[in-house]
């Protein structure tokens, strides 16, 4: 629908693709790794029909946005979000971050505050801190797990994405929560992303510590998570985010995998719309 310039690389503009639909209070939907704004297909119509202005955008390196070599750290990604909000002059925004996108929500608020932001939603999101190390033994992703992800992307990215999307939409033995054409569609979206961006984002979402950012969140916050999320398990992420933010609310979706906004759109949308109306 439109693009904005957020920087340059070798004199070439770095552009973010975004779509802006509906009228009313703005809701900005931030997609997960390694997909695009298309992953909100089941949310955009529901929000627009309920009277909201809905903005989706493709993170740099993904979807229809530019694919620069660098800039996949959360400080840069939060700045990209900041530039989009400024460009559209959005006020009283609800930021909804899914998976990796929850990191942008946290880092944006931690860096830029809440002058433009009214509410925050973390959906299957990576904060507070996934990395497992000697300094943070309660994490879930250790160096070996992260290396496995990175090697998968470097050695055969398409084969990795094929397996990853199977786990993404599966809850335990339930692998029929989305159709095979839908899974393959999402694999194709991921396949079109920047290989370098796909790789660099692994280190960003697995090793970035958002605990300091969450400590600065003083606005109404909702955590939506699937209780069967094998990609970003609730107990290591959403549960801790919920506990870290005063008066946060939580909607734990029974049988929900990581990609619960697609597998359980009714439950996801009901939780989101109820929170928006509070």
Describe each region flagged by the PLM.
Residues 31-33, 93, 97-99:
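Conserved alpha/beta-hydrolase "nucleophile elbow" surrounding the catalytic nucleophile
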Residues 131-132, 136-140, 151-215:
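Conserved alpha/beta-hydrolase catalytic His-Asp/Glu region
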Residues 230-236:
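Conserved alpha/beta-hydrolase "acid-adjacent" motif
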């Amino acid at each position: 629908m439109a693009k904005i310039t957020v920087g340059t690389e070798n004199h070439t503009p770095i552009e973010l693709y975004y779509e802006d639909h509906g009228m009313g209070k703005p809701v900005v939907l931030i997609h997960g790794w390694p997909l695009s704004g298309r992953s909100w297909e089941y949310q955009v119509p529901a929000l627009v029909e309920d009277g909201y202005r809905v903005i989706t955008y493709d993170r740099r390196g993904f979807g229809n946005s530019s694919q620069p070599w660098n800039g996949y750290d959360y400080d840069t990604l939060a700045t990209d979000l900041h530039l989009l909000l400024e460009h559209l002059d959005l006020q009283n925004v609800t930021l909804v971050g899914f998976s990796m996108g929850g990191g942008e929500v946290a880092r944006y608020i931690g860096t830029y505050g809440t002058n433009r932001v009214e509410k925050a939603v973390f959906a299957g999101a990576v904060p507070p801190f996934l990395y497992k190390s000697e300094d943070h033994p309660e994490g879930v992703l250790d160096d070996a797990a992260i290396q496995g992800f990175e090697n998968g992307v470097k050695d055969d990215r398409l084969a990795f994405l094929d397996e990853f999307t199977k786990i993404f939409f599966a809850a335990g033995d339930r692998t029929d929560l989305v159709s095979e054409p839908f899974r393959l569609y999402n694999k194709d979206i991921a396949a079109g992303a920047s290989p370098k961006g796909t790789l660099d984002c692994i280190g960003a979402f697995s090793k970035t510590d958002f605990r300091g950012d969450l400590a600065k969140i003083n606005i109404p916050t909702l955590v939506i998570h699937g209780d069967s999320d094998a990609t970003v398990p609730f107990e290591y992420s959403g549960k801790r985010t919920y506990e870290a933010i005063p008066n946060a609310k939580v909607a734990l979706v029974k049988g929900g995998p990581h990609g619960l906004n697609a597998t359980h759109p009714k439950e996801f949308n009901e939780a989101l719309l109820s929170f928006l109306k509070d």
